[in-house]
């Protein structure tokens, strides 16, 4: 369905949990352990109910996020049941990759088509530094197993000043021999991210252009999402740029989000939305739930305003909202 600005909203992102098995420095405090109680999370049945009603009004793609979605029990069955909904054309997962390698075969067999894996460095010492407790080999193993099981892979990378800027060319080489898309995502000033200085995608592109033959400039190659892609001579995969800060893409936004506790967010930046979990637990019918979702989608804000401090901005961290 369309929102009031005429944008076709066909993509639902649902966060299964705020829990994570890493503590990435720009996302979560090192000693954080105060997570949403299980009884406050949407149950898997409630999640499935939301997906069904969203599908009935035009949602075609579902992405499961977190936190780290694979720390939530029952993910395989949830994907299996979502895959039975006729209107849903694609089920995707955003993950840090630590637990994915040993689960991807079963996930794929039950309907998972794509994964986005967060990876900011190819150096073990830096990986430990940024994630605090992670193991790089597990992520690389997960990428390998995804390719073996025909699950399409996108790598999400954040470049930070004075941390991994010198690895840009090494990182894009992941897309050289493999059909992997690597996307550079500009750091957004949410939660712990406000403490770091990110590198703009225009600067990253210039670094790439100095060393590689770019076949397309990315100005028009946008494929059903916020990323603009370039092709590099000899590369099997593409290089993408998600420039939320320097190149606002809100006019093409096609998504709606639901947090772990069932709050349907109209926009990542703003605090507007409605708690679907509470409505369901208060006994509303499927038809009433559908109408609430339709109204929330229709009232989606025109754009974010991350560059300005606003009284109505969402103060929560990314892992609480759903990355």
UniProtKB/Swiss-Prot annotation:
[4Fe-4S] cluster 1 binds at residues 20, 24, 27. Pathway: Cofactor biosynthesis; molybdopterin biosynthesis. [4Fe-4S] cluster 2 binds at residues 250, 253, 267. Pfam families: Fer4_12, Mob_synth_C, Radical_SAM. Its EC number is 4.1.99.22. GO terms for molecular function: 4 iron, 4 sulfur cluster binding; cyclic pyranopterin monophosphate synthase activity; GTP 3',8'-cyclase activity; GTP binding; metal ion binding; S-adenosyl-L-methionine binding. Binds 2 [4Fe-4S] clusters. Binds 1 [4Fe-4S] cluster coordinated with 3 cysteines and an exchangeable S-adenosyl-L-methionine and 1 [4Fe-4S] cluster coordinated with 3 cysteines and the GTP-derived substrate. InterPro entries: Aldolase_TIM (IPR013785), Elp3/MiaA/NifB-like_rSAM (IPR006638), MoaA (IPR013483), MoaA_NifB_PqqE_Fe-S-bd_CS (IPR000385), MoaA_twitch (IPR010505), MoCo_biosynth_MoaA/MoaC (IPR050105), rSAM (IPR007197). Residues 4-233 form the Radical SAM core domain. Belongs to the radical SAM superfamily. MoaA family. Catalyzes the cyclization of GTP to (8S)-3',8-cyclo-7,8-dihydroguanosine 5'-triphosphate. This is GTP 3',8-cyclase. It comes from Clostridium perfringens (strain ATCC 13124 / DSM 756 / JCM 1290 / NCIMB 6125 / NCTC 8237 / Type A). The lineage of its organism: Bacteria, Bacillati, Bacillota, Clostridia, Eubacteriales.
